[in-house]
Structures are given as structure tokens and as C-alpha cells.
Amino acid sequence: MASTTVAQLAAELSRSAAALLEQLQAAGVGKATPEDIITESDKTRLLDYLKRSHGQADDSSRKKITLTKRETSEIRQSDGTGKTRTVQVEVRKKRVLIKRDEAAPDAQADAVEAQAPVVDAVEEARRDEEERQQAELLARQEAEAKAAREAAEREEAERRARQEALEAEQRRQAELAARKAEEEAAASRAVTEANEDSSRKKAEDEKARVTAERAEAQKAADEAKAAADKARAEQEVAARKRREAAEAEARAIQQMLNAPPRVLKAPSERKAEEKKAEQTGTLHKPVKPAGATTEAKKDEKKPATTTTTTATADKKGKVVKAGWQDDSSRKKGSGLKTRGDTSGGVGGWRGGPRGRGGRQQQHDDSRSSFQAPTEPVVREVHVPETVSVADLAHKMAVKASEVIKQMMKLGQMVTINQVLDQETAMIVVEEMGHKAYAAKLDDPEALLVVGGEEHTDAELLPRPPVVTVMGHVDHGKTSLLDYIRRTKVAAGEAGGITQHIGAYHVETDRGVITFLDTPGHEAFTAMRARGAKATDIVILVVAADDGVMPQTKEAIAHAKAAGVPIVVAINKIDKPDANPDRVKQELVAEQVVPEEYGGDSPFVPVSAKMGTGVEDLLEQVLLQAEVLELTAPVDAPAKGLVVEAQLDKGKGPIATILVSSGTLKRGDVVLAGSAYGRVRAMLDENGKPTKEAGPSIPVEIQGLSEVPAAGEEVLVLPDERKAREIALFRQGKFRDVKLAKQQAAKLENMLEQMAEGEVQTLPLIVKADVQGSQEALVQSLQKLSTAEVRVQIVHGGVGGISESDVNLATASKAVIIGFNVRADAGARKLAEHNGIDIRYYNIIYDAVDEIKAAMSGMLAPEKRETTIGQVEVRQVFRVPKIGAVAGCMVTDGLVKRNSLVRVLRNNVVIHDGELDSLKRFKDDVKEVKQGFECGLSIKNFNDVQEGDQLEVYEITEVARTL
């Protein structure tokens, strides 16, 4: 076994040998020099010592657990001021649990049972020698350690003895000092007590003397005070009696002087007169009682000393009252009693016993209790959407004339019954110093919310998807639907383009699908927006040979705004010039990414003509519908959307409705915007009668009171009276808002027309077969307006052209446009008699083009200047009575009589005028061509010189186009 010295171990531990020797000696290992040998047992003892010195327990140490428990309580305690304080008291308890190691006996038993390894004799001898050496070393070390311990014990005993002796001496000294201090304190206390006894005796004697003197003085003062109080009381009683007598005498004299001569009446007659005055008086001008004049004169003679009125002196020196005090404060209290009386209760509801009492007391009370308003009253005015001038004045408690004056200050002339919009009314209220709030009307539509909550617990069942087909015009939307429906709808549309929004439901092998076919022409933007609003999935049809067009981009925007998934159908792939890859790239630029590029929009190549890819398209649509998990309640009142509406001459108003939830049945009461009614008949898209329609099914209903606006929400109500009430409320609201907006825009239009000058207007009356077409046509025509010619839509409606339309056109000098409608016999005869122009169209852009041409004819023609010749002045002749005549040579073009000319001298225009005469030799001629000489004179210009150039031109008018 390799031997290790103290120096080597110190080098391994990076410590000095001296420090290691000190630690070995402290651990009980007797090593004196760095060359001593250290065995493994020495190292173990050193390690155990180091562990104990650093607080680390060995393996045989006990394991303990300390448990700490805290309890908190409160104690209420009063302090010196009497306030109660709460003191928090915390009690801590600690418990230590010790567990002995159970593995030690087992480890010892295992160590005993372990067999010794087999070693040879040489190894045994070497080990015996090492053990002997270690035993000797251990004995030597133990002896040295024992000696060191004995020396340390002796030294510790000596140190402890010295410490005890020192402590005993200190205790003795402290006892002596304490005894001495006690003796000194006892002596001082004795002296102090003696001094205190003598001073206390002197103080008691002095206090007794002072108390006796003070008692004598207090007794004398009490006697003097009692005598003075008695004399003062006698004087006050005598003075009060004299003052009361004088006041009574003065009052009697004053009453005698102020009392006018009058006929005395019995109390019953006075009460009758007071009752009559109360009956004949009014709120603002109560009738004065009999004694009011006397009281008024009496008040005038009295000095004005009240704080609620101001007094001024007139020319005669008489005091005249000027203030807020009215006649009711001077009268006897027998006027008309009002709830808002401010006379201190004299003439009000809570007056004295029947208003009786002293007149002077009543007058003083009324004058002292009345308070004049110090600032104007600020009212909170709730302004509805529309309000008349009279109602607005009533809300502010002012006269209507004040509101009219304020409106005139704001630059508007109004009448008392004129309707103001909410914004204008709120401005007027704030200008007049009140607070304006937008009022919430008693809206009957709130009943719709309450009614809709009753059916929120209906069972939700799967419903068919609503698919809208959108795209550019002539890209094959309707043809694609034709192939799906196996019909020929496109051939029936005028011009081969769709001008109505069509709703169909198709039963396929995979389920029912409802299709909405929207127009692709640019004029039908609102129709496409309604289609996207009501849809679940959008099929975007793009022609493979045409690519992405403006209406394609618009359809993408509508679909994204509605948040519905898009399925792209690349149509017309059977054409030779079809390029589907170009279409994909263009759609990627519009943020429509195909699935193969990592997007979420499936692209399906189809051919509506050949039927290629149609089945794949339907499969993609149904796959998207499954992902959406479309559900709707069936056993509930129906809700839906007006897809299209029209007026039939025989059937009346007809509306195409797409049911979104619930079941619509024949006989239900429906509300659509401002139209209501009971469903008299219900037809499907094929014109066949049906009794009910579930979710996602389009139907055509009859029985409404008027033609509803396309896009309105349809609701089924249980009560027809409630439906009529809501419809009438919406009609009145729409009318009031429309009138208010028109009135607000009148002044602005007048100012615009004054600034722009005269503007040509083309008044039109538009009648169409369905609501959507009329709306699209009106919007397209209004877009044609320019700064010089403006389209004015006098009236737009649905249905045939009637006599009332012709009369309106006669009054407004308008042109009637009929889109897919005709005029009846009476209307035609009336139009011929009045010279009214009626135009019929069935294609929307034909109507737009003709109106555009008519507006172009109304434009002022454009004036263009054309140079027709150049003339050089060769010689100038002065002719009496005529002036200067220029002899000229036509160098370019020709010269005509009465042509316009410019005189250029050194390439500078010095005159612009007209020819007066044109002659060749002595003959008047109409024109002179290039290369010929002529003589000419210019109107109002005689300063012609040789070498001048004449530029001959003419102005032509050119018709302008939009």
C-alpha cells in the first residue's frame, strides 16, 4: 500500500502543512511533523472531525422533523384617551420529532457476514507489518493526544479558576457600592421628608387664610349683584310698558291716516267677492281683490327696506318699487291659487287659514319669503330623431318665436310646424343654453326582441347550404346553373345577361343545395351585396379565357366582407384559348389562394357547356357545407330575407323570400321593413303552390301591403295588429327622416347652385319590374351626373306606368323610363296629350347609353378656333370716309368675307377683330384664295402698316360628349 505523508496530503488539499497538522491534532490524530505517515483511518477521523465542525451530521446521526404551529388572536384594550385599540397576539409552538436510522444495524450485520477476500502469505505478512506499524503509530498518537488533552484540561481549569475569582471580586465590589448608595439615599430621604413637613405646614396655613378672605369677598359681591339685578328688572319692565304704549298709539294714528273712505260690507259679502275673483282670474293675470289698490298705495308710502326688491325715486320723489315682486305679493291673498305660488304661502295651496290674518303680517311675509332667480334655468332636453319647431320650443319652455329667431341667426328660415332633424335640433338647444340629449323613442320594434327570445330553445337541425354564384358579366354563371338545374334560363334573359337575382333549390344525390344567381353587370352592385349577405358559400365563376375582371374583384370583396368561404369555378376550359394557370395567378394577386398553393379556396375547372367538372364542383360545395355544420331551428317562427320584390298588376305586391330559420307557412303574418300582411299564396321557384317552406328554401309570397325593399329582413309575428303598428311606425320614421334631411340640404343646394351658376338638370321617372332592377338603374343613372348636367330622379317605383306617373312627369317636365314594364291605355293617351316622352328598355346598359346621349345633347357646345389663311400687307391706301385700306397678298389658305382676323406686327398681336370689306380690284368678293391679291379693311382699326401679317381664323362649335 502506498504511504502518504502529511506534506503530500497538504499538497493534494492545497493547504499548508502546519494548518493540516493543527486540524489533525484537533481531530485526535497525533502527528507532529510533516514527514509523518497518515493512514486511511487517520483520514477517516479527520473527515469525521471536519463534518462535525461544519455542522454536518454523519450517517449514524438522528433524523429530526420540526413542526411549528402558530395561533393568532386579538385583544381589545383601551388607551389613556378612552379609544379602543386592537392588539394582535401570536402564539408560536414548536415540536421536534426524531427518528433513528434503522439501516445501520442491517449494514453492520451485512458487514459481519461479508467474507474476507483470499490473500497470499506475503500479502498477509505485509499487512501484519503495516498493522503493527499503524498500531505503534496509533499508540504514539494516542499518547501524544492524551498528553495534549491533559495539558488543555489543566489550562482550562486554571482559566476557569481565574475567571471565578474575578467574578467573585466583581460581585463583592458591586455589593459594597449598592450598600453605600442605599445609605446615602436613606439619608437624603430623611432630610427631604423633614423639609417637606415644614413647607406643607406653612402652605396649609396660607391656604386657610386665603380661603377665608375669598369667602368674605364673594359674599359681599353676591349681595351687590342681587341688588343691581333687582333694580335693572324694575327699569326694564317700566321701559317696556312705555314702549308698548307708544307703539300702540303710533299704530292707531297710522291706521287712521292711511285708511281710505270706503263702504263697510258684511263678512259674507266680502267672502262672495273673494270667491268670484278666484273664479274669474287667470294663471298669468289674476284679478286684483278689492283691497289690492289700497295695499299698493300703502306699500308705496312705506320706505323700501326689503332685500328682495330695489327702489328708485321718480321725478316727484315718490319711492317706486322695481324688482321681481309681482302683484300677488301686494294683494290680500284672495287671487287665483296656483301650485307654483312663491308668495310665501299667502296665495298658494298651503296658505294660512283661508288666507285670513293681519294685512301687515301677510305683506311682510310675502316680501321676505320671495326669492328672485339669479341665473337662467338650464333644462335637459331629450331630442328625438325628428321634432317640429313647436315641440322643440315646448320642451325648452320657451315660445316658438324664440326658436325661429335662433334658427334665423343660424341661417335657416323655418316655420312653427316645420320638422327639424335631430342634429339641427340639438344645435339649436345648445345655442339657447340648454343641454341636449339624443332621446330614445318608445320604439315598438323593441317588442321584436322580446318576441324573438321566446324561441331560443328550439331544436337546431341541419339545413341545406345557400350558395351564391358570383362573377363578371358573360363569364357563364347562369349557364353553369342551367346545367345543374337542367333548364334554359339564360336564353330567357334579355340580351343574354342576368338582370334579376334568381333563387333556386336543387336536389342532388348528395343533398339539397339552394343557389342564388346574381347579375354580373356593374350596375347590380347592391344585388351582389345582398346575395353575399344571405349566403353560406360563394361560387366565384371566372372565365378561363378572360381572367379576373372588375366585377370579379368586386365579388371577392363582397365575399370577404361577408366572411363566407369561396369555391372558385374556372369556367370555359373547353375553349382553345383557355389558360387556367393565368387565372390562378391573377386570383392569388387578389388574396384568393388555391389549396394546392397552401390556401383555403378549392379551384375546380368546369365547362358549363360540356358539363365537365360540375360534379366535382358540387362535391366541393357540399364538403364546405359539412365543415360549416349549418343548422337552424325548424319548429319556430320563420325569419328570412327579401331577395327580390315586384308589383304585379293582378296579384299585387310579390316578394321572393329566402327563409333562413324556422318554417314559413301559408296564413302567417309577416313583417318586411315597412310592409306587412298575411301570406295569401306561396309559390316555389317553379311557380307551383306550396304550403310551407323550411330553412334555406326560396319562395314567392303574396299578400303584403306594399312592395318591400330588397334586402329587408322578414319576420313572422303572432299578431297582425302588432305587425301593422311596427310597419306604420317605420313608415312615419322613414318619412320624417327623409323630410328632415331634405330640409337640411335645401340651403346647401341653393348655395351650391349660386356658386356654380346655372346647372342643367335632366328629370327622370324610373319604373321597373322588380325592386332590385329599379335600384340598380337609378344608381347607374345618378352616376352619369356631371358638374354641368345633373340627373334628377323625380320618382322611382316598381310596377307598370300609371296615369299618376304621367301627371307627375307633366308637372316636373320629366322623361319616363320603363324597364321591363309598359304603360296602360289611360297613361299612354294622357302622355300623348301632354307630350310626355316614355322610353321602354329591357337591357340596363341600353337605358344608360341613351340617357348618356341625351345628357350629352344638353351640354354647351365646345368652341374651337381654326386658322384658315395667312395674309401679308403689301401697301396701305387712305380712302376718305372709309379709312385705311390694305392691299394684301394671300400667302396661305384663303380669306372669307366677315372672317375674324388678328393683326400681327413683328409677331405680336396688336388687334383682334373682324373684316369690314373684301374686294378684288373693284368688285366685292366672298373669298380670295392663296396666291391672289385683294384689298380689305378691318372694322374699327385704321392703324394698318406695310409688312403687317393678318391671321384669318374662324370659330366652330363642336358638340360635347360625356
Curated annotation (Swiss-Prot):
Listed Pfam families: EF-G_D2, GTP_EFTU, GTP_EFTU_D2, IF-2, IF2_assoc, IF2_N
Protein's job: One of the essential components for the initiation of protein synthesis. Protects formylmethionyl-tRNA from spontaneous hydrolysis and promotes its binding to the 30S ribosomal subunits. Also involved in the hydrolysis of GTP during the formation of the 70S ribosomal complex.
Top-rank lineage group of the source organism: Bacteria
Span list, region G5: 607-609
Comp. bias regions, Polar residues: 78-87
Official protein name in the record: Translation initiation factor IF-2
Residue ranges of the region described as G1: 471-478
Residue sites binding GTP per the record: 471-478, 517-521, 571-574
Region (G4): 571-574
Region called G2, residue ranges: 496-500
Family statement drawn from the similarity comment of this UniProt entry: Belongs to the TRAFAC class translation factor GTPase superfamily. Classic translation factor GTPase family. IF-2 subfamily.
Species per Swiss-Prot/TrEMBL record: Cupriavidus necator (strain ATCC 17699 / DSM 428 / KCTC 22496 / NCIMB 10442 / H16 / Stanier 337)
CDD domains: IF2_eIF5B, IF2_mtIF2_II, mtIF2_IVc
PROSITE patterns for the chain: G_TR_2, IF2
InterPro entries, per database record: DNA-bd_dom_put_sf, EF-G-like_DII, EFTu-like_2, IF2_assoc_dom_bac, IF2_II, IF2_N, P-loop_NTPase, Small_GTP-bd
Region of interest called Disordered, as start-end residue ranges on this chain: 52-87, 121-378
Main location: cytoplasm
Biased composition (Basic and acidic residues): 52-77, 123-183, 197-250, 267-278
Gly residues composition bias: residue spans: 342-355
Key words, A-Z: Cytoplasm, GTP-binding, Initiation factor, Nucleotide-binding, Protein biosynthesis
A GO cellular component entry from the record: cytosol
Ranges annotated as spanning the membrane: none
